[in-house]
Amino acid sequence: MTFDGAIGIDLGTTYSCVGVWQNERVDIIANDQGNRTTPSYVAFTDSERLIGDAAKNQVAMNPHNTVFDAKRLIGRKFNDSVVQSDMKHWPFKVTTKGDDKPMIAVQYRGEEKTFTPEEISSMVLLKMKETAEAYLGKQVKKAVVTVPAYFNDSQRQATKDAGTIAGLEVLRIINEPTRAIAYGLDKGDDGKERNVLIFDLGGGTFDVSLLTIDGGIFEVKATNGDTHLGGEDFDNRLVTFFTEEFKRKNKGKNLASSHRALRGLRTACERAKRTLSSATQATIEIDALFENVDFQATITRARFEELCGDLFRSTIQPVERVLQDAKMDKRSVHDVVLVGGSTRIPKVQSLVSDFFGGKELNKSINPDEAVAYGAAVQAFILTGGKSKQTEGLLLLDVTPLTLGIETAGGVMTALIKRNTTIPTKKSQIFSTYADNQPGVHIQVFEGERAMTKDCHLLGTFDLSGIPPAPRGVPQIEVTFDLDANGILNVSAEEKGTGKRNQITITNDKGRLSKDEIERMVNDAMKYEADDRAQRDRVEAKNGLENYAYSMKNTLGDSNVSGKLDDSDKATLNKEIDVTLEWLSSNQEATKEEYEHKQKELESVCNPIMTKMYQSMGGAGGGMPGGMPDMSGMSGGAGPAGGASSGPKVEEVD
C-alpha cells in the first residue's frame, strides 16, 4: 500500500531527521534504534552496507570505508578550496576522474567502488524513507527535502538528484528557514505582525534568516550564512588541540598518522564539546589511543571558547548582513529563535544575545527537529492536505544569491537580485556587441561581485541565427525564471526573427546527467537488493542457530531426555554438534545453504521427537519442558523457544 501524502526530510551534514503530518500534528519519527535523529553516515564492509547508527557505531574500526559529510561535497567541484581543505580531516578517500567531480572511493565486498556525493546522500535519504515506511506501514513515494538557505543552484540540483536516486519524487527542495513554521505554529496567531530572526547553527552549515510572520504568512525578508560552518569545525579545533597535547605528553608521538586514532579522538572530542554546553570542564579518556598509549586530558569551557573564538564571532556578520538587506534595525526584531544543535553552546548564545542588547533568546522549539517539522508541514500542504492549523499558511521564500549574465567586459549584469521572493520571473533586453554578429553566447552567473570572474558560473548556451545588423540593433530578450525550488530556467529570444533558445541550469560540469542518474537509481536498487539478501541470509543463519540450540536445550531438559532412547539421544546430540560445528566454520554461507542445513537437521530431529511425543500419548499443542512446537519449524525456520510465528530477536554482532 502506498502512502498518499509526503514526508519531510531534513538531510543534515551530521544528522538527519524525518517527520510526517498525521492526526492534526507533526510526528517526528524515531528510527529502528529508537533515535529521532539518524547519523548521516554510510559504511561499507566486506559483507554489507550500513547506514545511520550502525555505520557510525563501527567507524573507529573501519574509518577508511565509513563516509560522512557528503553534504559538504554535494554540488561542489573537486578542486574547490573548501573540498581540498576538508579532505585533510576525512579518513575516507576522495578522488576525481579528471572531470572535477568529487568521487568517494571505498572498499566494498572486497573490491574498490566509487560513489558520487549524490549517491551517498541518496543512501541516507533511503534510510529516512525506510524509517518513515516502518512507522506508517505503507510505501512512501514523495518527499520534501530541505537545504541550507545559502546553498547555491548546483548544490540544490544535486540534492534533488540524491532524492531521485533514493526512489523518491522530490516535490520541493525548500530552504531550512522553513523551521520558522514550527515556531509559528507553536506560538499561535495573536494577530500582530512579528519580525523573527532564525539563527541556525548545525553540524556543518550556518544560516540566518529574517522573516515577518503575519497571520499564516511567513515572508522571508533576507537570508545569509555560511555553507561551511558548524559543529564539525568546532570538533576539528578540539582534535588539533588534543593531538598537540598528546604529542607534548608523549615525547613527540604524532597520532595524526593514524586514521583510527584520529577517529577515536574525534568521537571523544564531540562528546567533550557536548559536555561543555552544560559543564565548565570536560575530561576525555581513551585507552590505547595510539601505539598502545592511554590518553587522558581535561579541557575547560573557557579554553574551548578561546580555541573556537574566531568561528563563534564569525556568526555575527551574517546577522548584520540580513538586517542590512532587510533594511531593518535590530531593535525591530521581536524574537530571535535558535535552531541547530550547535546553538546549545553557551558562548554562541551569549554572543547572539549581546548583539541584540541582552535580548532573551527563544529556545522553545527543539533545535534538532525543527527543520524536519517545517518540511513535514510543507509536505502536507503540497500534497493537498487540509487542516485548521495549516489553513492560510504560506511560506514566501527568497533566493539567497544574485543571478545574472555576463555582458561586455566581463561585467555581471543582475536580472534577479538576492533576497527576491520566489518563484519569480524577470526579463531584460540585450543586444549584439559587434556589427553583423550572427549569434550570442549567454553565460549565466550567480554571486554578489561586480565582475563575473569573481562569481560562480552556472551554465552557458548559444542563440544563433541572428540576421546581419549593425551592433546594438538586434533585440535579444533574456528571461530568468526561478521556480519554487530555487532552480533556474533561462531563455533568450531574438525579437526580430522569434529565434529562441533556453537552458535549465543544470550546471553540466558539476551536475549528473540523466543517464548517470538512471544508472545510479538502478545501482541503488541493486544495493537495496544486496542489503535485503544480506538480511535474509542472516535471518536464515539465525533460524538454523536458534533451532539447533533450542533442540540442544530441550535435550538437556530432564522431562524430555528421560523419555528418549539412549540411541535416539546420541543421534540427536551428534547431529546437533555437527550442525553447530558447521555453523561456526561457515559464517558466510548462503541463505540456501543455511536453509538446507536446517532441513537436514529437522529430518533427523522431527521423527525422533514425534515418536517420543506419540509414545507419551500427546496430540497437538506444544511440547513439555520448553520444547518448540515442531509443526512451525519448516524451511526458513522460526525463532527459538516458541512457535515460529513468535517475535524474532536479531543477533547483535
UniProtKB/Swiss-Prot annotation:
Keyword Ion transport: no
GO molecular function, one term: ATP binding
PROSITE patterns per record: HSP70_1 (PS00297), HSP70_2 (PS00329), HSP70_3 (PS01036)
Annotated stretches, region: Disordered: 616-653
Residues spanning the signal sequence: none
Biased composition (Gly residues): 633-644
Family recorded in the similarity comment: Belongs to the heat shock protein 70 family.
NCBIfam families xref list: PRK00290.1 (NF001413)
Protein name in the entry: Heat shock 70 kDa protein
Gene source species: Leishmania donovani
